[in-house]
């Protein structure tokens, strides 16, 4: 156990981190292009934030939260989702007093949920999330959907489907609750135990249940779209017009309710088809009452979350190649007793802001090693005379490798013992 990561967690190893960095850079770029600024909130919050914000009838609160008492006897919870913490930060720091809308994103935020680990879903996973506060119009909903769609398309994800729904508001949802209770009332015995316990307080949770028997029970259930109030109906129609105008294909799925109680009006999912079936890669919606519920002013908001592990898994399964960056700008080798001279050269190059690695020449005895290390320049610190000629012959093969692979730009430096200073050729300053 000592040398094993806890179940449901995973290490990102040095040889794999470039993949994360590439995806994260694309996410940052997409957020910045749309005017979102980064927010970083604590990895844990007071438990009450999630009880009030996420909803005490959700799977997250009832089954999945990592909650504990700290040494001050305060109930603390590791963050199970990103929105509640972002809203808390907005309220605590009165960010709503600035110009609206207030647009923020979080990236590589660790999320903790105690659930059965599966491919693309871990107990600790990382999210990219966007939150837009103070935007009432459905154009904000459309903007986030389009941003997620274009980001995933840029990353090479294919077969994307945009699924949308409206789950109404406090004005029209009670009517739907009554309809759903009437429809499911004679079917309670067929529900799972969790849905039975939630049925009276929040029958919508039955629609979100992953148990097959519950999914069968609700497949012919009435649709919320049939009882939307005029405001919700107009908002949903407006969203569809924006998506159509942007040329983004979408479909209406009245079964989407998402797993969080704070959603109102728009909910959406971006789904892709894989060899193993449908995979939800992004989900979100509008939450017009959450800011007020947490203690702020009445402020409309919309957001989404996207799992980074799931995006990377999807890219792997579709064979999408992520460009590997050059590991070293300059690679210094040395022969014989020239370790000190090589060390001095490395430090001078680092001051000049070159990515650098110093290694004994004996460790670089294969041409393929130069390619594997993604080296731009190879620097050899050596004596003049026979050793120099011998090593040049060795490096000639690497020059051939350069022409074959385009991986190495070869540069030779000659360090001379006896007070001569090591010079840096112009070619070394090439990036």
Spans of features found by a protein language model:
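Intrinsically disordered, low-complexity segments enriched in glycine and mixed charged residues
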Residues: 351-431
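TRNA-recognition modules of translation machinery and tRNA-sensing kinases, especially anticodon-binding
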Residues: 1-353, 358
């Amino acid at each position: 156990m000592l040398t094993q990561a806890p179940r449901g967690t995973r290490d990102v190893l040095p040889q794999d981190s470039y993949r994360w960095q590439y995806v994260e850079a694309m996410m940052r770029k997409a957020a910045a292009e749309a005017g979102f600024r980064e927010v970083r909130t604590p990895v844990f919050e007071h438990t009450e934030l999630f009880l009030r914000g996420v909803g005490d009838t959700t799977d997250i609160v009832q089954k999945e939260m990592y909650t504990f008492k700290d040494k001050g006897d305060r109930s603390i919870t590791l963050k199970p989702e990103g929105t509640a913490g972002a809203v808390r930060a907005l309220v605590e720091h009165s960010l709503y007093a600035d110009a609206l809308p207030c647009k923020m994103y979080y990236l590589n935020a660790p999320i903790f949920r105690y659930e059965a680990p599966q491919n693309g879903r871990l107990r600790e996973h990382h999210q990219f999330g966007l939150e837009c506060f103070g935007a009432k119009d459905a154009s904000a909903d459309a903007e986030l959907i389009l941003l997620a769609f274009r980001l995933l398309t840029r990353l090479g994800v294919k077969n994307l489907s945009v699924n949308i729904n409206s789950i109404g508001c406090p004005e029209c949802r009670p009517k739907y609750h009554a309809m759903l209770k009437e429809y499911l009332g004679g079917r309670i015995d067929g529900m799972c135990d969790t849905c039975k316990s939630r049925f009276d307080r929040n029958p919508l949770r039955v629609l979100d249940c992953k148990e097959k028997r519950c999914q069968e029970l609700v497949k012919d259930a009435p649709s919320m779209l049939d009882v939307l109030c005029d405001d919700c109906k107009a908002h949903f129609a407006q969203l569809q017009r924006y998506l159509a105008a942007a040329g983004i294909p979408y479909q209406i799925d009245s079964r989407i309710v998402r797993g969080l109680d704070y959603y109102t009006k728009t909910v959406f999912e971006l789904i892709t088809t894989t060899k193993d079936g449908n995979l939800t890669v992004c989900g979100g919606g509008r939450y017009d009452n959450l800011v007020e519920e947490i203690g702020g002013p009445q402020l409309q908001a919309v957001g989404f979350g996207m799992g980074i592990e799931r995006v990377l898994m999807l890219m792997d399964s579709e064979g999408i190649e992520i460009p590997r960056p050059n590991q070293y700008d300059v690679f210094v080798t040395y022969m014989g007793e020239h370790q000190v001279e090589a060390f001095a050269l490395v430090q001078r190059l680092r001051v000049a802001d070159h990515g650098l690695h110093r290694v004994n020449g004996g460790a670089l005895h294969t041409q393929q090693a130069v390619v594997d290390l993604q080296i731009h320049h190879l620097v050899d610190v050596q004596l003049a005379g026979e050793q120099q000629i011998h090593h040049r012959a060795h490096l000639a093969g690497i020059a051939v490798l350069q022409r074959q692979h385009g991986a190495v730009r070869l540069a030779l430096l000659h360090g001379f013992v006896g007070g001569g200073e090591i010079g840096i050729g112009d070619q070394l300053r090439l990036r």
